[in-house]
A protein has these predicted regions:
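Single conserved hydrophobic/aromatic residue that forms the stacking wall/gate
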Residues: 196-199
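Non-heme Fe(II) oxygenase catalytic core, chiefly the N-lobe of the double-stranded beta-helix
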Residues: 1-193
């Protein structure tokens, strides 16, 4: 089953080791986990996230938390005449977080802070199921194929273009269209339109 809601569980900065093991197993099985009614501050979010691997500092430093640069703000809120977060009011195309890096993110932990009264939904897709649904001849054709991942193309379509320093940190890169999950084994289809320029 794609996606699971974990009930009656409070995330903490220093969880028990058995809780981390259980969360990892659930995450591997369901690919997406939802924890409602949490009371994290930014330090807690970073501390909890570190239990799942090294944290990437996003290339868009102007939208990072000053106290905890591991956190990227996604927001349309303005302070002192400027937006505090990336993407603003744009409807973002389907994408794989940080697929434009040599080593793409294994996952993302999103925490909702200030929500609009309606809309603002975040949608997720099971890309293993998407791969499984492809005709066998298409899978054969795509096996081993690469797609050009361009963070600059993403920004031109959905956000504010990067500066020269940011461009240097995120050059275009080729990644396989089909990737095998390192833990559970199923193949995932990573060809999502937001970052690709050419297959």
């Amino acid at each position: 089953t794609f996606g699971a809601e974990v009930l009656e569980f409070q995330l903490t900065e220093n969880p028990l080791s058995e809780d981390i093991v259980a969360i990892r197993e659930l995450w591997a099985e369901h690919k997406l986990l939802l924890f409602r009614n949490q009371s994290f501050n930014e330090a807690g979010l970073v501390g909890f996230s570190r239990h799942f691997g090294d944290l990437e500092i996003h290339v868009r430093e102007e939208y990072l938390s000053q106290e905890h640069p591991e956190i990227l703000y996604v927001s349309n809120i303005e302070r002192n005449g400027r937006r505090i977060g990336i993407l603003s009011d744009n409807e973002v195309g389907w994408h794989y977080d940080q697929i434009y890096l040599p080593k793409p993110a294994v996952g993302s932990l999103l925490m909702a802070d200030t929500l609009p009264p309606e809309g603002g939904n975040t949608e997720f897709a099971d890309m293993c199921a998407a791969w499984d649904a492809l005709p066998e001849k298409t899978k054969i054709r795509l096996d081993g194929a690469l797609a050009n991942q361009s963070y600059e193309a993403f920004n031109q379509a959905y956000s504010v273009p990067t500066n020269n320093k940011q461009k240097a940190r995120s050059p275009d890169i080729h990644h396989p269209i089909a990737r095998t999950h390192p833990v559970t084994g199923p193949v995932s289809y990573t060809h999502l339109r937001a970052h690709e320029t050419t297959p």
